[in-house]
């Protein structure tokens, strides 16, 4: 799994590529989000478009990232499609996250 961070205005876009499962990226995502929050970056967009699969441990870590950001007065939004979107729906995570189909829509929502 690969994680890259880029900035668009005040939003940190975390681009994740590859499979996310226990031991394969869940801790890397946690560490990267902690770094961002520690640096004062509290508007975070998780771009998971290039993640073909997430197991329950990885989903739990995404939820934990949301919780950490909220504790700092921040927000985490997600961009997902396909099987990952189905998994989020089954877990009813649409109640927790603002979910978008593309990065541009998510960025536009941050400036509302």
Segments the model singles out, each with a brief description of its role:
Residues 2-31:
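STAS-typified acidic loop motif
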Residues 20-97:
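Amphipathic alpha-helical interaction surfaces in cytosolic regulatory modules
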Residues 98-102:
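Short acidic-hydrophobic, aromatic-tinged amphipathic segments that line or gate anion-handling sites
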Residues 110-112:
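A short, charged, amphipathic alpha-helix used as a generic interaction element across diverse proteins
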């Amino acid at each position: 799994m690969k994680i890259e961070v880029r900035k668009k205005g005040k939003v940190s876009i975390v681009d994740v590529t590859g499979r996310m499962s226990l031991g394969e990226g869940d801790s890397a995502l946690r560490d990267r989000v902690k770094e961002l929050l520690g640096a004062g970056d509290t508007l975070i967009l998780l771009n998971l478009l290039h993640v073909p699969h997430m197991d329950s441990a990885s989903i739990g870590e995404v939820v934990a990232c949301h919780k950490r950001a909220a504790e700092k007065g921040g927000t985490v939004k997600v961009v997902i499609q396909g099987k990952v979107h189905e998994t989020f729906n089954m877990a009813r995570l649409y109640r927790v996250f603002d979910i978008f189909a593309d990065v541009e829509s998510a960025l536009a929502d941050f400036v509302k």
